Swiss-Prot record:
Site (Important for substrate specificity): 18, 78, 160
Gene Ontology cellular-component terms listed: cytoplasm
Annotated localization: Cytoplasm
Protein name: dTTP/UTP pyrophosphatase
InterPro entries noted in UniProt: ITPase-like_fam, Maf-like
Tagged with keyword Hydrolase: yes
Family as reported in the entry's similarity comment: Belongs to the Maf family. YhdE subfamily.
Cofactor(s) needed for function: a divalent metal cation
Alphabetized PANTHER family for the sequence: BIFUNCTIONAL DTTP/UTP PYROPHOSPHATASE/METHYLTRANSFERASE PROTEIN-RELATED, BIFUNCTIONAL DTTP_UTP PYROPHOSPHATASE_METHYLTRANSFERASE PROTEIN-RELATED
Function (record text): Nucleoside triphosphate pyrophosphatase that hydrolyzes dTTP and UTP. May have a dual role in cell division arrest and in preventing the incorporation of modified nucleotides into cellular nucleic acids.
């Protein structure tokens, strides 16, 4: 379907198993390249969409010297935006519990910034999905944190895991964005190249 990409070798710069799963589902051939320590810090003045876009651009810049002449690099970053602040990946069990408590019974946004980069050009975009959580009790939060893998996920949850089944009341926007990559929007962007 994306014959226009035949001239490129697609490189996904991500350790995320969910992003790999989504790229595989898109049906394009790609390889994964990762660097050990890409800086994911950002200026405190950034808000909402600006944060994951900034980090996606920084990730692309970190890989710039590795991009071959026929390569198309995809970088992404996802945050949970809640009550005026970004929730990234938790730093430990207690941090994960506190994040989930703060999301319980409330709405938040999941925002992913994506950059598609070659040696000659770069195109970046953001996707925003509104998510509403049901009220979660302490046992549900502890069960999820102790039995699943919240530590590698923005906001301490994976919508495709148990917490998504029992805790997510509604989603407005891309479900796949909540997983970490707005694959439909990425497909549309790639189709226009």
């Amino acid at each position: 379907m994306l014959a226009n990409l035949d001239r490129y070798k697609i490189v996904l710069a991500s350790n995320s198993p969910r992003r790999k799963e989504l790229m595989t589902g898109l049906g394009v051939d790609y390889v994964v390249k990762t660097l050990p320590d890409v800086d994911e810090s950002y200026p405190d003045t950034l808000q909402g969409e600006e944060i994951p876009l900034f980090i996606a651009r920084e990730k692309a810049a970190a890989y710039q010297s590795m991009i071959g002449p026929e390569e198309l690099l995809i970088t992404a970053d996802t945050i949970v935006w809640h009550e005026g602040k970004a929730l990234g990946k938790p730093v430990g069990r207690q941090d994960a519990i506190e994040m989930l408590r703060s999301l319980s019974g409330k709405s938040h946004q999941v925002i992913t910034g994506v950059c598609v980069t070659t040696r000659e050009w770069q195109k970046c975009f953001a996707a925003v999905t509104d998510v509403r959580f049901a009220i979660l009790d302490e046992d549900e939060i502890a069960y999820y944190v102790d039995h699943y893998q919240p530590m590698d996920k923005a906001g301490s949850y994976g919508v495709q895991e148990w917490i998504g089944f029992v805790g997510v009341e509604s989603i407005s926007g891309s479900y796949f964005n909540v997983m970490g990559l707005p694959i439909q929007k990425l497909y549309r962007e790639l189709k226009q190249l």
